[in-house]
Amino acid sequence: MKKIALIILIITTFKTQAQDRVITTGVPFLLIAADARSAGMADMGVATSADAYSQQYNPAKYAFSLNGQGFSMSYTPYLTDIANDISLGQVTYFNRINERSAFAGSLRYFGLGDIELRQSFEDTPRTVSPNELAIDVSYALKLSEQFSMAIAGRFIRSNLKIPDGTSDASAASTFAFDVAGFYQSEEEAYSDFNGRWRAGFNLQNLGPKIKYDNDVTNTNFIPSNLRLGGGFDFIFDEYNKVSVTGEVTKLLVPTPPERTIVEPVDSNGDGTIDNSEVN
């Protein structure tokens, strides 16, 4: 019992220290799930079967799509407990050029609704609508019958700066790319069912920082991350399948350094602390 209590204490202490070093990035809307399947599976998608929304999690899956082409459109209300006009919309199209390759394109738009600005209660409000968007293009190629890779390019535009009449309110923009891979085994016969293995990886949002206000000192990392996953399909017949999938995600941006607060000390004992005694 003492060992268990000690382990819990260590984990709690580590968690408390980690919360003091919160990692923040620009354009976090890139990590919001746009489709119902991924959202319902805790943002998993790098090693699931191919669908029209594979662009966000692993475009290499398009090379294994059973459909020659596909189109998807989604609308996701976001943070509805805070506001009723924050939402994410996405449109995606993919096309299998041949048996080995496919390309896809998508547009993702994140709107933060209308915000009223006024200097005082009596002023006539001025309405602004901050928003962010990303345009993606990807190409997938089968390197073998069971493995494919893909590369995706992404243009990102963030228009969050609220003009105040004294500073530049131009939108910030940057670019990023993804490198992804997907493995899918041949369907194998077991005693009571057929089965198939899946695995995937994706290095996402690799690119330079995003710069706001045209100021080189006011920059933010974009949410670069690594996704790894694997799974197995229990295939009972043409219409019934159960999939077991597991994935891990690692954010690839620096963790803020620990800050040490030095308490001032009255070294000479005179009851006051001057600047020379503050480190």
Segments from the language model and where they lie:
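Bacterial Sec-dependent N-terminal signal peptides
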Residues: M1-V22
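Subset of outer-membrane beta-barrel
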Residues: Q19-N279
